[in-house]
Amino acid sequence: MSEDSRSQTVRELGEFALIDRINAGREQAAHVLLGPGDDAALLAAPDGRFVVSTDMLVEGRHFRLDWSTPTEIGRKAIAQNAADVVAMGARPTGFVVALGCPADTPVRVVEGIADGMWAEAVRAGGSIAGGDLVHSEQLVISVTAFGDLGGQGALTRSGAVEGDIVAVAGELGWSAGGLAVLSSGADVSDPAFAHALTAHRVPQPPYAEVIDVFGVHIPNALTDVSDGLLADLGHLAAASGVAIDVHAAALTDPELDVVAARLEADAGQWILAGGEDHAFVGTWSPATALPPGWRPIGVVTAGSGVTVDGARPAGATGWESFRGAGATAAPGER
């Protein structure tokens, strides 16, 4: 990055020069037929359908520049959208990004966000097809993700049936642990906190654990863990008209327990209600072998709601934008 770009503000460089800079040298994914530079982008829809998802991140609510680098923020913005697309059984193809920022925002901040977005988009199998850049009072990021079902049926939350095995791919609780470290004022350079901080700043959805089993090991229902395991399983159970019982013993994580002990916190609550891990959780017929990377954590039963070892959870179950998440939410980020 040039010294000029490190000292310039968005006002000084200008909207169109900044757009040119953050798009220079980028290579589009195969499904993006026409990227930035025209009135709109052009994406291929090989089987005539798109999976589409949108999320918005607001500075001070969903991220803080004193807690995360611009590149980390960009990666997180794409990851949470890509995870939604993959959870529907689609391969991410393209992303459209809208960014609002104050005029005195350093150009390097916008460049860092763009670099992070591109890195995660490529990791997910897509690219940034276009977007918008506007003036706003604070940093605001909106991402719309597109995905290709490849001729397969969409995976939804509504297909779980009684007797299904509930299984998860990816880590649980680590993002909440990282948020707890940042919120507590603990020493972020302590190696004991490194993995938790990375999990919160740059979630790593296990895309391959879903994409690689398309058409081979198909779950009856699937969702990603964004609001919290119990909350997201609650959405799945309600959509399917079933109940889900989670087995606490299947969710223990001794390494996360160490982090929680340092903060005098409850790792179990992070795992059950923390959210933002962007793991995937689904239900599978007991006659179907779980694919690699998936582990059983519970069972689908008759009834409604979610229980843990047969009992209704007493604490917070996850995040809700206008209510927060009780002890699992910290002022300034979520």
Model regions: which residues?
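Active-site glycine-rich loop that binds ribose-phosphate moieties when present
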Residues: T144-L155, E162, A192-F214
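Residue-level signal for inorganic ion chemistry
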Residues: L42, N81, G89, I128, ...
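Glycine-/charge-enriched secondary-structure boundary and capping motifs
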Residues: S2-A24, S68, P102-S127, V134-I141, ...
